[in-house]
Design a protein with these regions (language model features):
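Conserved strand-loop elements at the edges of beta-sheets that form or border functional pockets
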Residues: 8, 26, 74
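Flexible loop residues that form catalytic
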Residues: 125
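Conserved N-terminal subdomain of the carbohydrate kinase-like
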Residues: 14-19, 23, 41-122
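Histidine-anchored nucleotide/phosphate-binding helix
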Residues: 29-38
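Short glycine/serine/threonine-rich phosphate/pyrophosphate-binding segments
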Residues: 28-29, 79
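Positively charged, low-complexity intrinsically disordered leader regions
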Residues: 1-20
Length: 127
């Protein structure tokens, strides 16, 4: 494995599609990390999830893509979620909650972790 090139910092959530009774790992930063990795660039993800089923879903999705998650923190509480409706193929975001991400902030160890990357990308929802 090559050394990681870029670290993606920020939001994650589970997208809930009640009409289809489906759940997907998502969020701007998670989606970006997956896209970067699928384009052949080694990357890491820095964020926070709850210790619930949805947090496990996010972790599993990132690990499945072989994204470095050593600074993905898990905290007591619920992972962020978004309810999404589909209307003729268009997504309509109707409700969301940040949950454990509300109070999340970088720690000293996070900054040390970031030193090993050539690039850092953060989303508007990175706190």
């Amino acid at each position: 494995m090559n050394p990681p090139e870029i670290c993606i910092i920020g939001d994650n959530c589970v997208d809930l599609y009640p009409q289809q009774e489906k759940k997907y790992a998502g969020g701007n930063a998670v989606n970006t990390a997956v896209a970067v990795k699928r384009n052949g660039i080694e990357c890491g993800y820095l964020g926070i999830v709850g210790n619930d089923e949805n947090g496990k879903r996010i972790i599993d999705a990132l690990q499945k893509e072989a994204i470095d998650c050593q600074r993905l923190r898990q905290q007591e509480g619920n992972t962020a979620w978004t309810k999404v409706l589909l209307d003729e193929g268009d997504r309509i975001f109707i409700e969301d909650s940040l949950e454990v991400q509300k109070e999340w902030d970088l720690e000293e160890q996070d900054y040390l972790y970031l030193d090993k990357f050539n690039w850092v990308h953060h989303t508007i929802f990175s706190n």
